[in-house]
């Protein structure tokens, strides 16, 4: 049951992350820069988490070592978003999204090399299907498979994915972080990220004033659904099912963005995109069922090994 909840948290995290365009695009249309939007997003989300902590009477205090890890996590979280936005200036958004979503591969490699955790065959199959699905969905943003990219752009987006992969792995494998209250962890990661975004914005004209009441509402919703809800769900998922499985479930993020584009912004779904959606759904289904599938295969192999040689 705990793992089932973990899968639900993972899908909730990726689905709510996919709501980013719903609140970001209208705000950008009013003239706000991405630096300002991201800064307000993290600050407002931090305030919401702080209110929740006060309601639930969660202690705000952290030790020096814990704070060091939290600031580092905030840096990786900031780096993932900042590097991805930088990469958008050097290549098509579709290509950048596809390369960024290689991060499940990064998580799998880090877990295998540093923690000797080998992925199951079903996890590998799910990763391949999810990456293929994301690639097909991303073609919508690049006008097909065309598009060029500079070496710097490719490096930026790969570093973006690596930064997010390190964030996912760290949350689950550093004891001080893994045992920390989820609200406290989320608060200090978001606050640290806000600080880094604020520094970045100061080099690009500073943080803009919020232009209207509608923009304020969108920023608050941006802070709540694709930030507060998604990050709390993400942390719960990582602690329940691990970094690798959570990272693969992240493929639902572009799927949600597609649905929002169709329903809210009147975009159309092509045959290629439909195939991408199908591949992601199959990948997520495999991930959810993987514990049962792995257990079933292990049991069959055990029974086969116990059979007399003459009867095999």
Regions picked out by a protein language model, each given a short descriptive name:
Residues 48, 53-54, 103-128, 255-275:
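C-terminal transmembrane-helix exit sites in multi-pass transporters
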Residues 19, 26, 45-63, 132-147, ...:
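Membrane-interface helix-cap regions at the ends of transmembrane helices
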Residues 4-9, 35-51, 126-132, 152-159, ...:
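Hydrophobic alpha-helical transmembrane segments of multi-pass integral membrane proteins
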Residues 1-11, 105-162, 277-312:
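Juxtamembrane helix-loop boundary signature in multi-pass membrane transporters
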Residues 27, 37, 41, 87, ...:
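Hydrophobic/aromatic residues within transmembrane alpha-helices
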Residues 16-21, 53-100, 136, 223-241:
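Specific transmembrane alpha-helical segments of multi-pass solute transporters/efflux pumps
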Residues 1-40, 75, 83, 146-173, ...:
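Glycine-/small-residue-enriched transmembrane alpha-helix faces in small-molecule transporters
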Residues 8, 14, 40, 96-102, ...:
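Helix-helix packing/entry segments at the starts of transmembrane helices
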């Amino acid at each position: 049951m705990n793992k089932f909840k973990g899968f639900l948290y993972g899908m909730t995290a990726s689905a709510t992350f996919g709501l980013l365009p719903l609140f970001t695009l209208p705000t950008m249309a009013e003239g706000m820069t991405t630096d300002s939007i991201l800064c307000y997003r993290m600050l407002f989300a931090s305030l919401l988490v702080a209110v929740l902590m006060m309601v639930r009477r969660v202690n705000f205090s952290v030790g020096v070592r814990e704070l060091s890890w939290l600031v580092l996590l905030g840096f990786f979280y900031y780096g993932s978003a900042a590097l991805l936005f930088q990469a958008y200036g050097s290549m098509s958004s579709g290509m950048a999204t596809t390369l960024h979503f290689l991060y499940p591969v990064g998580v799998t490699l880090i877990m295998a090399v540093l923690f000797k955790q080998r992925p199951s065959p079903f996890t590998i199959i799910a990763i391949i299907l999810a990456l293929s699905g994301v690639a097909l969905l991303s073609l919508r943003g690049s006008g097909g498979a065309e598009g060029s990219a500079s070496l710097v752009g490719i490096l930026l987006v790969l570093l973006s994915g690596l930064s997010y992969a390190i964030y996912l792995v760290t949350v689950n494998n550093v004891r001080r972080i893994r045992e920390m209250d989820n609200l406290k962890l989320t608060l200090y990661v978001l606050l640290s990220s806000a600080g880094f975004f604020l520094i970045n914005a100061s080099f690009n004209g500073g943080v803009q004033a919020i232009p209207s009441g509608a923009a304020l509402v969108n920023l608050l919703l941006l802070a709540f659904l694709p930030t507060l809800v998604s990050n709390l769900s993400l942390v719960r998922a990582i602690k329940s099912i691990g970094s690798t499985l959570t990272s693969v479930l992240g493929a639902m993020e572009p799927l949600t963005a597609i649905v929002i584009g169709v329903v809210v912004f009147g975009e159309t779904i092509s045959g290629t995109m439909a195939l991408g959606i199908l591949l992601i759904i199959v990948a997520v289904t495999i991930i959810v069922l993987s514990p049962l599938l792995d257990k079933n295969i292990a049991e069959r192999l055990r029974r086969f090994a116990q059979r007399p040689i003459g009867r095999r």
